[in-house]
Amino acid sequence: MQDSDGNLYQPGYPTCAGNTQLTTAFGDCSYRYSAATDLLPQTRKISGMAEFTKALPANNQVQVQYFWSQSSATGYSGPMFYDFAMDPTSPYFPTGAGLICDGQVTCGTPLNLSGVNSTTGNAQPVNAIWTDPNNSRYGRDLNVEQRILLTFSGTNAGWDYSAALNYSKNHNDNSWTGGIPNEDVLAPNGVLSPLINPFGPQSAAGQALINSSYINGVYQLGLDTRWSVDLNASHPLGDAFDAGTPATVAFGGNASGETFRNWTTPYNDLTSAATGLSDSNVSGSRKIQAAFIELDVPVMKSLDFDVSDRQDRYSDFGTTNNAKVKVRWQPLDMLTVRGSASTGFRAPTLFNLYAPPFLSAASGGTMGDGNPYCQPGSYTAEWTQQTCAAQGIGLYGGNTKLNAETSQNFDLGVVIQPIENLGITLDYYRILLKNTVSRIPASAVYGDPNTFSNYIVTATSGQYAGTLPPTIAEASNCTPYTAPTCGYIIRQYANTGRITTDGFDLSVQYSQHTPIGTFREDLEGTAVTKFLEQQYDGGPLLNLVGNLRIVDLNPAFRWQHNVRVDWTSPNKMWGAGLGDRFYSGYVDEFPDGNGNLRHVGSYSLVDGYVSVKPIENLTVLFGIKNLFNTSPPYTNASQGNFASGYNALIADPLLRNFYINLRYTL
């Protein structure tokens, strides 16, 4: 609870009854959020494609293709947190007797249950901050995609050509299917019903009121469309250098358009405290015209140059020109040397630009270790240890002020074929990205509030950080006193600076034909030697090889690989295979208890399968993932999701699991 002076107390401590997920392990009534969150939502996908191809006279053809797909994801997330004023006549209104602060936290004194702030003299009711005892919210995301493609291709007067018309539409909706209340039922006019006990177990009447408050429905809809017209043609120019292969010129053009729209429904008015969405109806669009030309010139039998140039004109990001040069040299039959250099351009997506703003949890403590008010011995009635450690609130969504990403790319490699059926490629790559589009990490904002002061929105309020304000306006304008936990940090898309990375890609492929069948071995691996990244524009470039990336906490692995061994019987009726996915270890986000760097161990997963073709056109595959039931290595990283103790970006929390795949070809 929060008294009229903004001090925080836990009337239910140390019993912490009334919710099965409350624990006293940290010296207060803490909620185990991960235990009430579905880490692997149930997914379902149905898709189909129809294709018609007809040959036309003189080596031409027309093709029509239609694709339809429906996918859904259903799961549950942590419960609603409520923050309602209490009626002093409620039988559960605190009396002041026996009240203590949150564990070891020192609160302001004396306890003020008067309903009037002792500093300002303004009315300030006592607020009950509590968790839905039914624990989880249930939701569903539904996506329907349709695409139609019309293509003409063939040869005419020595020219190879293709022309395509494409139109696609993607419709999605987000809905709550359980655990979301109509707050007017629980707290008419913002005052908690006296039937509800926010500090302990519910009475039968209180539980019945909570159960009857839930409402289901679609709260947000989205629609994306895209159309494009593509024309491409190529023609041989002749063998001017007697290289044995004629030079070729290719050129083409493209015109496309896309739209984005996202809007909330009237149902969102009743559930905005759960979604963090204010009512919105946002949209955006763009048109693009592009033209390219490519010239492939063999200057001798062993040496080939390829030069291309592309110009794009965006209705919202202007004109850009990018070129690419490729060289291929084969001094020996068994050895090929290849390389390329290019520039690139990527405009922010319409979602990056126009996604609706919404409030949601931001990982990390409210103001982090960099805040002088959040140091031991510096706490006050407003900057308490509780409010400094509370999970903060972030404002998410699009940003129409984004700049486009640009890139420079270089690679140089060799292809070696020392014996028949064995191919080895080794390529060095170097990539430079500028104006990368991402989000500034919450940990960076909390850890250095002075540098990121423009990303912190404070307000004149005692709104508890762990409670999501119903609207952005309320998060920015609440009373009566100044506290850092009222407001939010800005987590909208931003240009976060530069990334420079280089390393090596290794590929080894080998096949063997034997009396018992054909064996194929394949290795695909990447070694990263440099990964420099800025966490904000103008910030220092940090070498993160073997560490967690700052922006998304995805490890920059020194080495990772996929190895596969497949076997096919001589009659092609049977098949089997094994695969290994390996990721090298890295430095964890937080040090150990002694302040030393903590390392996350390497991770290897072995998968296998057996397949059979019992009849023509039917293949049945039985597979096993994580054959050796390997547990993921422990990590203490705060990943911005609710996967606790393991890295959900690479690890499989299912451990050993089985699957079956049926494929029938008409």
Predicted regions span which residues?
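Transmembrane beta-strands of outer-membrane beta-barrel proteins
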Residues: 62-64, 161-163, 229, 247-253, ...
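Outer-membrane beta-barrel pore domains and translocons
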Residues: 53, 67-71, 166-170, 252-258, ...
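Short loop/turn motifs that connect adjacent beta-strands in outer-membrane beta-barrel proteins
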Residues: 56-59, 155-160, 238-248, 299-303, ...
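Residue-level signature of outer-membrane beta-barrel architecture
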Residues: 52-54, 154-156, 235-237, 293-297, ...
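C-terminal beta-barrel architecture of Gram-negative outer-membrane proteins
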Residues: 360, 521-613, 628
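Hydrophobic, lipid-facing positions within transmembrane beta-strands of outer-membrane proteins
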Residues: 46-50, 146-150, 225-231, 289-295, ...
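C-terminal beta-signal and adjacent terminal beta-strands/loops
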Residues: 423, 434-435, 529-532, 581-589, ...
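Surface-exposed, low-complexity loop segments enriched in small/polar and acidic residues
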Residues: 2-43, 49, 59-288, 316, ...
